[in-house]
Swiss-Prot record:
InterPro entries: Poxvirus_G7. Part of a complex composed of A30, G7, F10 kinase, A15, D2, D3, and J1. The lineage of its organism: Viruses, Varidnaviria, Bamfordvirae, Nucleocytoviricota, Pokkesviricetes. Pfam families: Pox_G7. It comes from Vaccinia virus (strain Copenhagen) (VACV). Its main location: host cell. Belongs to the chordopoxvirinae G7 family. This is Assembly protein G7. It is found in: Host cytoplasm; Virion.
Length: 371
């Protein structure tokens, strides 16, 4: 029996974004292409051609172009994807040929079979290039973080370095773009432009973790009419870096009236008299949940957010199909790959000629000098 191909949750999300961004303005059910796209991560070289041919065949069978105006709209969307095609000459040959077919309606109608074949090839070219680039970067990231050939101290250090590197990526790059604020440059003012991309990413990783950008984003969402009352996800994810000083501040508003309310003596609690049993149970449940997360008892990694419908990537507000599904998603993946490489170089062990000593610690070993 053939071994089951490894799957990547990250790539499942990324590939769906890529497919939907490329097929925007095209009347086609993208589910089959999305299912094929997911197979390109950890895909043996012998199977890639079959998967890509499956994508082309789906396009060939389902894509219809009614008029030249529709074709022009599709081409306007596809133009920006040229940056992620390894052979730009191929891209522009197909793209410019399709442009020529929009010269007159009669010419368009006469050449429609050729137009469809050309468009299907262009779409397949873009999808296969972007998906393979994304798969390579996701594979690198996951293999770097999941590598078993590490000491526990190195693994812990790398996971924490990567966690806060991603937090800075969100705070200094993604959130400012979403709310329309200028992106902060990682380099110091007065310095010459950084030619080494790795050095630029390194400086991004070294920027302060505590910023006001999350609060600024909440203000932005509030002005747009988005409910921001449930922000537990940002605390759990470690993005909203704040110390909670008073529990009452983060409980439902009714708890804040405790100081001005009469205490229910027979219930031996500090709840005001106008709170019913259902509200008391809800407050108790919230406290229990918070305690489990704060003490590490609940470590399932599940995170929900008021910024999403908690269903699919397409329900993001206000990101939706505007940012995550643009071609820039590959730029974010590339930044993450460079981050992972920088973290690896920073934490790789060097041979210092010492002696490895086994100790009764979860970290198991330490290095000592030869004496």
């Amino acid at each position: 029996m053939a071994a089951e191909q490894r799957r990547s949750t990250i790539f499942d999300i990324v590939s769906k974004c890529i497919v939907q961004s490329v097929l925007r303005d095209i009347s086609i059910n993208s589910e089959y292409i999305e299912s094929k796209a997911k197979q390109l991560c950890y895909c043996p070289a012998s199977k890639k051609e079959s998967v890509i041919n499956g994508i082309y065949n789906c396009c060939e069978s389902n894509i219809e172009i009614m008029d030249k105006e529709q074709l022009l709209k599709i081409l306007d969307n596809l133009r920006c994807h040229s940056a992620h095609v390894c052979n730009a000459t191929d891209f522009w040959r197909l793209y410019n040929s399709l442009k020529r077919f929009t010269h007159t309606t009669a010419f368009f109608n006469t050449c429609k079979p050729t137009i469809l074949a050309t468009l299907n090839t262009l779409i397949t070219l873009i999808l296969s290039n972007k998906l393979l680039y994304a798969a390579e970067m996701v594979e690198y990231l996951e293999n770097q973080l999941d590598s078993s050939n590490k000491s526990m101290s190195q693994e812990l250090a790398e996971l924490l370095e990567m966690k806060y590197a991603l937090i800075n990526l969100v705070q200094y790059r993604i959130l400012p773009m979403i709310i329309g604020e200028p992106i902060i440059v990682a380099g110091f003012s007065g310095k010459e432009p950084i030619s080494d991309y790795s050095a630029e990413v390194e400086r991004l990783m070294e920027l302060p973790v505590k910023t006001d950008i999350v609060n600024t984003t909440y203000d932005f969402l509030a002005r747009k009419g988005i409910d921001t009352s449930n922000n537990i996800a940002e605390y759990i994810a470690g993005l909203k870096i704040e110390e909670i000083e008073k529990v009452e501040k983060y409980l439902p508003e009714v708890i804040s009236t405790i100081a001005n309310s009469n205490i229910i003596k027979n219930k031996k609690s500090i709840f005001p008299a106008n709170i019913n049993d259902k509200q008391i149970m809800e407050c108790s449940r919230m406290l229990d949940t918070s305690e489990k997360y704060s003490k590490g008892y609940k470590t399932d990694g599940a995170v929900t957010s008021p910024l999403t419908g908690n269903n699919t990537i397409t329900t993001f507000i206000p990101i939706s199909a505007s940012d995550m599904q643009k071609f820039t998603i590959l730029e974010y993946l590339y930044i993450m790959r460079v981050m992972a490489n920088n973290v690896k170089k920073k934490n790789v062990g060097k041979n210092n000629g010492g002696v490895v000593m086994h100790i009764n610690s979860p970290f198991k070993v330490i290095n000592l000098p030869k004496c």
